[in-house]
Amino acid sequence: MLNYESTHKRLPPGAQARPPYGPSDVKASATTLMLPYFEEGALSSRYDVSQPYWLQPHAVLEMPVPIFTCPSNGFQSYSNEVFSIVGLPSGLQFATSDYIYSRGATDAWCITFRYPKAVVGPFTIGMDYRLKDITDGQSHTIAMGEGAGGERWPVCQKVGCTTADPAGPDASYPWMAGNLPGDQMLPNYVGTSTFGCTMEAMNKRAVTNTLIVAASATNCDSSEAGGSHNVSNFRSDHPGGAQFLCCDGSVHYLTEGIEMAFYRALSTMAGGEVVQAP
């Protein structure tokens, strides 16, 4: 991540995208953009970042990357059946990642990007922040956390949910997919994304789904403020907590018992809080 920033003078966007941010306007996830910096130059050379992920060679979509897999979770493939709307062949399996990018302490999505400054994390769709934007301090700001998938992590709908959707997939998500589940393209889809937030406690089970509601695309309010969007919670297969990467490159194990105000403060980059990662 920091090697990418050293080259480009910015962090990668959580997902490379352009207005109006429809499904075909999202081209590559932050993970895809950083492949060369993970010593995956050969895989990166086969990925056309000018095209959506579902138009990439099938061999690329199915290629697991060891650095993206937590040893406590193990490789989880991801069925494409819910993506048949974009013409993917039945039976194709996506390789997944156990690590997701911090949206901060908000679960809002909006195309105007007018989020309250105090709740924003260092990654979102279509925005690439500079390190100097992280005024809370790089060592005090979460960049990524664990986003485990597999049968232990079913998904439910809406903040505060606990009952898994019986028809939904588990919380696994493809490493190359920067798209957000939306109610226009995939109206019946209940799943996650490449992003996580601290609106809810880590390791909440069932995992809250990620969803952008097209009719509210200009509403930057979080669910606490009456907004209609969702972002999934962080989760891991480590007992009692999860691993998080801060913006200075340090890794910290946070426990499930962390005080929520402190947890949220660690996830924001310009909230003005005085906190220190344990």
What are these regions (language model features)?
Residues 1-278:
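Surface-exposed loop/linker segments characteristic of extracytoplasmic
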